[in-house]
């Protein structure tokens, strides 16, 4: 920042989640520095907040090895062009939002040119490919981390890191309105309710749906009034789930929902879900849960050798103990899943204790992340 020009922040977001984070950061920065300039690779939300887009975010939003290889030349061209143009612009700070495979190399290129760099959202280096931490340390002046154990990991390697809390924890109330969610979904207040969330990826839905449905059938024997809600992320996953249900449990009555995962979690007494961000969201919804996950045997064998954590779900990683039951591979079968869910549906001591711990963990990571991120950017820009 100089007397001649406004504070200039360069940003690169590579997918929708990054666009949401970028928009929140820009909004918080504009409140403090109204004339700041924002430029880079932006999605519609960031652009709506005033970010000048040199490239559209969709240019970077490619998934899968085949898709990346098909777009590799274009991606390398964009990264080289951004290195050149940001180098000429000399922004006060560069913020790479997630998209580590693209952004960390770009951050390193810019840092060599004397530009201060932030990586916003830590990759899962604490879980696997831990040696990436050294590349991140060379490429960035600061990592912004959502979770406290991420900061503890970076501290071990003397990589500057700031824990800012999680934006999802800011967005969700500490005490959700369960009856309000049931009103929205048409679930009676006095019914037992189970949410099934078999994942957002096709492979997960294919691998988990049958066992999740069989588990629900077993639970219906104990709770004949059991309402079962199944939020599905899009029409393709819904069609896939309906096909599996027709084969496995054609007579099982369920509420299929288009999206509405958060409402389903808040409304339910318990959830059975695949691991991932859904487990964190379920914790923040204060819905007791069991995590069930299965992958192809070779993939699991490889993952066991690569992954360096004791748990797979974020609630357990945050708690530092097995707060929620994780049933993986051969353990992920209807009898064991149902046995783990029964005490949660009973709404007794087990689920109340889990609820209380969920609330404590929510408070720990509810830190107004947008404001914290903006403060970190401004401090680095000085």
Curated annotation (Swiss-Prot):
The keyword Glycosyltransferase applies. Its EC number is 2.4.1.182. One of its GO terms (cellular component) is membrane. The keyword Lipid biosynthesis applies. It comes from the Bacteria. It catalyses: 2-N,3-O-bis[(3R)-3-hydroxytetradecanoyl]-alpha-D-glucosaminyl 1-phosphate + UDP-2-N,3-O-bis[(3R)-3-hydroxytetradecanoyl]-alpha-D-glucosamine = lipid A disaccharide (E. coli) + UDP + H(+); a lipid X + a UDP-2-N,3-O-bis[(3R)-3-hydroxyacyl]-alpha-D-glucosamine = a lipid A disaccharide + UDP + H(+). Keywords: Glycosyltransferase, Lipid A biosynthesis, Lipid biosynthesis, Lipid metabolism, Transferase. Condensation of UDP-2,3-diacylglucosamine and 2,3-diacylglucosamine-1-phosphate to form lipid A disaccharide, a precursor of lipid A, a phosphorylated glycolipid that anchors the lipopolysaccharide to the outer membrane of the cell. This is Lipid-A-disaccharide synthase. It comes from Shigella flexneri. The lineage of its organism: Bacteria, Pseudomonadati, Pseudomonadota, Gammaproteobacteria, Enterobacterales.
């Amino acid at each position: 920042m100089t007397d001649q020009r406004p504070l200039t922040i360069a940003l690169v977001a590579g997918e929708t989640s990054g666009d949401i984070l970028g928009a929140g950061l820009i909004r918080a920065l504009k409140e403090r520095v109204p004339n700041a300039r924002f430029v880079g690779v932006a999605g519609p939300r960031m652009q709506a907040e005033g970010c000048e887009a040199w490239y559209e975010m969709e240019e970077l939003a490619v998934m899968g090895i085949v898709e990346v290889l098909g777009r590799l030349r274009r991606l390398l061209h964009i990264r080289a062009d951004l290195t050149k143009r940001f180098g000429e612009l000399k922004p006060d700070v560069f913020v790479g939002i997630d998209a580590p495979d693209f952004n960390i190399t770009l951050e390193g290129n810019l840092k060599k040119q004397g530009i201060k760099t932030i990586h916003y959202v830590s990759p899962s280096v604490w879980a696997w490919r831990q040696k990436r931490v050294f590349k991140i340390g060379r490429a960035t002046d600061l990592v912004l981390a959502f979770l406290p154990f991420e900061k503890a990991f970076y501290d071990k390697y003397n990589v500057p890191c700031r824990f800012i809390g999680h934006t999802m924890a800011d967005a969700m109330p500490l005490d959700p309105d369960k009856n309000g969610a049931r009103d929205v979904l048409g679930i009676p207040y006095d019914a037992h309710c189970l949410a099934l969330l078999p994942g957002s990826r096709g492979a997960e839905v294919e691998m988990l749906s049958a066992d999740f449905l069989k588990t629900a059938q077993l639970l219906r024997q104990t709770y004949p009034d059991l309402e079962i809600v199944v939020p599905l992320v899009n029409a393709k996953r819904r069609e896939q789930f309906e096909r599996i249900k027709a084969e496995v449990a054609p007579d099982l009555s369920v509420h299929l929902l288009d999206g509405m995962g958060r409402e389903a979690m808040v409304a339910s007494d318990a959830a059975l879900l695949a691991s991932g961000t859904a487990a964190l969201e379920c914790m923040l919804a204060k819905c007791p849960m069991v995590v069930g996950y299965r992958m192809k045997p070779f993939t699991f064998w490889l993952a066991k050798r690569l992954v360096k954590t004791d748990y797979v779900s974020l609630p357990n990683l945050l708690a530092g103990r097995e707060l929620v039951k994780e049933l993986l591979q051969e353990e992920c079968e209807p009898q064991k899943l149902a046995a783990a869910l029964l005490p949660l549906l009973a709404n007794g001591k087990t689920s109340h204790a889990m609820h209380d711990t969920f609330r404590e963990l929510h408070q720990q990571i509810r830190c107004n992340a947008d404001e914290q991120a903006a403060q970190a950017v401004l401090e680095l820009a000085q």
